[in-house]
Amino acid sequence: MYLEYTEFISEGAEDVTEEEYARHEMRAAKLIDRMTHGRIRDETAVRPCVRAAMRDLIAQSIAAEREDRQHGGREIASVSNDGISVSYAQQGDMQAHRALIRARIIAEYLTGETTEDGVELLYAGTDA
């Protein structure tokens, strides 16, 4: 586990149950493992940048799930106040936007980080 529930809560997260946290933590950890090609899975000490990425990924995932519940799974694309008009984004656009946010979070925290052998964590080639 890259980030404990107590750490997540201590960094300002509010109104998140342990059950809700566990579900989103697992998704975030799997995403980090996939994007780093498993290079950090067996490290004994969790890097601060990985903790920070986990915190932001979990928070983003929880916010997205709550937004889906609030708007029936649809993301608001625009709102017109005078005529009281609400437009919703297409489902594919919403998923692509969220994937881009997750990729940016990972890139922000893990770009430039290397293994003990000098291989960048996000490098997609072979570690030869």
Q: Which residues fall in each region the model found?
A:
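Divalent metal-cofactor coordination and adjacent catalytic microenvironments
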Residues: 1-128
